[in-house]
Regions:
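Phosphate- and other anionic-substrate recognition elements at nucleic-acid/protein interfaces
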Residues: 1-133
Length: 133
């Protein structure tokens, strides 16, 4: 989970996210990167900030990896539980079961990242939307 100092300006925080994602990609050299598509957020300010951060993530992924796969919340729920309306707790329990963990991963963002990775593994990455070689 990437965190940034709350006392930094938003543009600096975005730059820190880009640098952190780039460093992770350079360190682990993934062949592919999977991300969750943005969902509607009732808080407009939060939604816009999340969209900016997501854009930085996508830019780093395409620029440094080349293969980016995106999954909708519905695709993730169906892949993990077989039910498109599963709630967050049900999905987290499936992560715990799939990975043989004694408890649900914390923080929630870590569990969310694992859900996306498991969805990508489960679907075989057949939904790629972007590919740059």
């Amino acid at each position: 989970v990437i965190t940034t100092p709350k006392d930094e300006s938003f543009p600096v925080r975005l730059a820190l996210i880009y640098e952190s994602v780039t460093k992770l990609i350079e360190t682990y050299k993934p062949d592919e990167i999977a991300a969750e598509e943005l969902f509607f957020n009732t808080n407009i300010t939060t939604g816009i900030n999340v969209a900016h951060a997501r854009g930085v993530l996508l830019l780093a992924a395409i620029h440094h990896c080349g293969k980016l796969y995106e999954y909708t919340p519905l695709q993730i729920k169906q892949a993990m539980t077989g039910y498109g309306r599963a709630d967050k707790k049900q999905i987290q329990q499936m992560v715990k079961v799939y990975l043989g963990l004694s408890s649900v991963p914390k923080p929630d963002d870590a569990a969310d990242a694992l859900v996306v990775a498991l969805t990508h593994i489960q679907t075989g990455g057949f939904t790629d939307k972007f590919y740059i070689q």
